[in-house]
């Protein structure tokens, strides 16, 4: 393969000398005796060669290949240098679908639809990266490689980030030969060029491994339903076996000391589960029944459930007549600000600013119009039947200073709530997290790429974001280096499925842990992946009243799952000689890379950036986890609300009397009125008349003047 790529360079030089200005790379010549060079390798290698020899601006690079078929394929080919792409096999497949009457459409119309879908996906990817023209995107190499050797990167994908090493050019050659042999029998006895599904998008027997498969789903549901811990251990045993081949933590193991501690000496299940949270799944994306079941379960455990970005029905903000607390402890604030009035914020124990989403990095939320039923629209303060899309960036955040302002606003809106910022695991997230900590956030959430969202297109889910193991380790280490680790809690999520997963996350720096897909599975989710279509057959991810009748989940199932995870985590802690979760946080020295046979693919992965943390020693442990006394001081006692407005209005507020005052303000008075507005909301919600409290402001108020104030409170300027 290496010689074949070198031959490409020679042929390109010859064509250039002969006066060619367009080079076409084609794999149509594949037959019994000719194996194709992988299209991305060919394009990127030739691009790098032409750039180095200063010929690229004189030549266009066109690819004719049967490989590209999905949005990501086209995006990487363009990003690594292709000028144009002819996906002939994808187009032949469209024709075959029409010929076999599986697609009732004119060929040219069908091809046009296919092209439109691909182009829309490419444009979306470019937009996520802040790029507005395809010319700027071509050759930009804005990717990170996972599992590719440094020599391959340096020679063929120059300057592309690749942090964990991986397969060599020889391994790639072996893969190509294996695929070729499957189509063309080496003995010449049989030729079978039909395409085979690898089960990448949906589970297929004998194809790609999926962590959630019929066996694991059955064991998880039955064990949590019955409260059977031994059956749950069967589930985690299967998961741990599958993880060996599917994610980075599967390549790690614990380095146990000669002597552990007794299980009774380890932090209790009741204490550990308070660190657990459910993921940000909005009311609208999942059903009322599913959303409330999660809240009831987590409140029972003294953990935290998350509203997602869809607001929360006001009837849930107080304990119901049945004595159950359906109020989500975490209230999310996303770029669309759907359903974020003052009462929503004042009812929170934690307010989460969603800067990004692990399951679809670079994109905002999207609730299709068919799922925006009247009751959803009412909660989100929107219009029934109209799709709700959160823009990828927050319209008011373009710097750390802007983020600091929003954090300050939200702290004023609820002085008792922790402020959390959700980030995606990606290269450089540690630097961003350091800025977030300096801006005053009390929790930083690092969200991994393989958290599941059924409400996003596959191009948004696959090949976007990175494993939480990389982002978490980077964030933890960067915060320590900047003297900020003790000021913030670190949380992580992204397909945490077992006590071992959680223990590894703690060793890499996490203090709190989020679960989303697993709790849904315990409530009945069967991974149909039709969440966005409003057709969920088990009533979990639908607003259809008839389908919701099929929901049979119970809080007890989620409670059992969380307690089982904590119990299994305790067992690992006992073997490691660890008494509390705080002792475990950041102890990457307790993790080792598993040993694999020399030359195997697993042996080529380099985990040193994740595991070799110079601060991961017990004696340096003081600043390695959150210290409550070191939390950011917002100096709320010095605000104009605390020093002037609340003292002036205190008696009128207590007696519900109308009152008007006049004050002098300046642009130093940020979030003016927000603290007092929160006091009104806590005491009376929206049950006071308009203009009950009026403040005449002389001068110019600062940023976020009157943010989140209720209707009974008015500022006059």
Regions found by a protein language model. Name each.
Residues 21-27, 88-93, 301-318, 420, ...:
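Glycine-rich phosphate/pyrophosphate-binding loops
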Residues 1-5, 62-68, 281-287, 393-396, ...:
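Active-site mouth loops of central-metabolism enzymes
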């Amino acid at each position: 393969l290496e010689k074949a790529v070198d031959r490409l360079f020679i042929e390109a030089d010859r064509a250039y000398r002969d006066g060619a200005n367009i080079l076409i790379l084609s794999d149509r010549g594949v037959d019994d005796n000719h194996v194709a060079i992988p299209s991305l390798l060919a394009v990127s290698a030739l691009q790098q060669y032409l750039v180095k020899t200063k010929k690229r601006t004189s030549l266009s690079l066109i690819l004719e290949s049967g490989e590209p078929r999905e949005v990501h394929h086209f995006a990487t080919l363009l990003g690594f240098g292709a000028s144009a792409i002819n996906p002939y096999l994808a187009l032949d497949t469209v024709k075959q679908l029409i010929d076999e009457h599986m697609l009732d459409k004119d060929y040219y119309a069908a091809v046009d639809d296919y092209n439109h879908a691909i182009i829309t996906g490419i444009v979306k990817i470019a937009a996520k990266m802040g790029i507005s023209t395809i010319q700027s995107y071509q050759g930009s190499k804005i990717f990170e490689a996972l599992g590719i050797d440094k020599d391959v990167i340096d020679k063929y994908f120059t300057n592309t980030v690749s942090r964990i090493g991986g397969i060599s050019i020889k391994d790639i050659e072996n893969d190509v030969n294996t695929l070729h042999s499957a189509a063309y029998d080496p003995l010449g006895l049989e030729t079978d060029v039909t395409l085979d599904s690898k089960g990448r998008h949906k589970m297929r027997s004998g194809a790609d491994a999926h962590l959630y498969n019929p066996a694991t789903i059955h064991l998880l549901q039955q064990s949590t339903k019955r409260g059977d811990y031994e059956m749950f251990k069967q589930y985690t045993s299967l998961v741990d076996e599958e993880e060996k081949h599917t994610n980075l933590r599967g390549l790690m193991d614990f380095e146990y000391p000669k002597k552990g501690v007794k299980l009774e000496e380890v932090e209790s299940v009741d204490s550990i589960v308070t660190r657990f949270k459910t993921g940000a799944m909005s009311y609208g994306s999942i059903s009322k029944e599913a959303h409330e079941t999660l809240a009831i379960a987590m409140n029972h455990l003294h953990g935290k459930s998350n509203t997602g970005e869809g607001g929360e029905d006001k009837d849930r903000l107080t304990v119901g007549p049945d004595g159950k607390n359906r109020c989500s402890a975490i209230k999310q604030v996303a770029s669309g600000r759907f359903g974020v009035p003052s009462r929503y914020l004042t009812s929170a124990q934690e307010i989460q600013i969603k800067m990004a989403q692990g399951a679809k990095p670079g994109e905002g939320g999207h609730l299709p119009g068919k799922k925006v039923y009247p009751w959803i629209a009412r909660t989100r303060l929107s219009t029934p039947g109209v799709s709700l899309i959160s823009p990828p960036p927050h319209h008011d955040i373009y710097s750390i200073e802007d983020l600091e302002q929003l954090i300050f606003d939200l702290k004023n809106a609820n002085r008792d709530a922790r402020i959390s910022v959700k980030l995606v695991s990606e290269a450089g997230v540690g630097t961003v997290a350091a800025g977030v900590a300096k801006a005053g956030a009390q929790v930083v959430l690092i969200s991994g790429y393989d958290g599941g969202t059924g409400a996003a297109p596959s191009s948004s889910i696959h090949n976007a974001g990175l494993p939480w193991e990389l982002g978490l380790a980077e964030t933890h280490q960067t915060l320590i280096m900047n003297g900020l680790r003790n000021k913030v809690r670190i949380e992580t999520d992204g397909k945490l499925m077992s006590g071992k997963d959680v223990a590894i996350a703690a060793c890499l720096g996490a203090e709190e842990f989020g679960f989303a897909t697993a709790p849904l599975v315990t409530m009945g989710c069967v991974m149909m992946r039709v969440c966005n279509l409003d057709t969920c057959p088990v009533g979990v991810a639908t607003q259809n009243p008839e389908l919701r009748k099929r929901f049979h989940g119970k809080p007890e199932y989620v409670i059992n799952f969380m307690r089982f995870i904590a119990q299994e985590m305790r067992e690992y802690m006992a073997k490691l000689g660890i008494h509390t979760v705080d002792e475990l946080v950041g102890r990457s020295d307790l993790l080792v890379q598993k040993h694999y046979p020399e030359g195997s693919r697993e042996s080529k992965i380099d985990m040193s950036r994740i595991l070799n943390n110079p601060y991961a020693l017990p004696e340096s442990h003081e600043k390695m986890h959150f210290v409550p006394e070191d939390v950011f001081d917002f100096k709320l006692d010095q605000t104009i609300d605390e020093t002037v407005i609340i003292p002036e209005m205190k008696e009128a507020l207590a007696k519900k009397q109308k009152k008007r005052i006049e004050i002098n303000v300046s642009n130093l008075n940020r979030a003016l009125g927000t603290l007092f507005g929160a006091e009104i909301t806590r005491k009376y919600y929206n049950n006071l008349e308009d203009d009950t409290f009026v403040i005449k402001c002389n001068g110019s108020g600062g940023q976020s003047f009157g943010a989140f104030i209720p209707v009974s409170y008015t500022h006059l300027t």
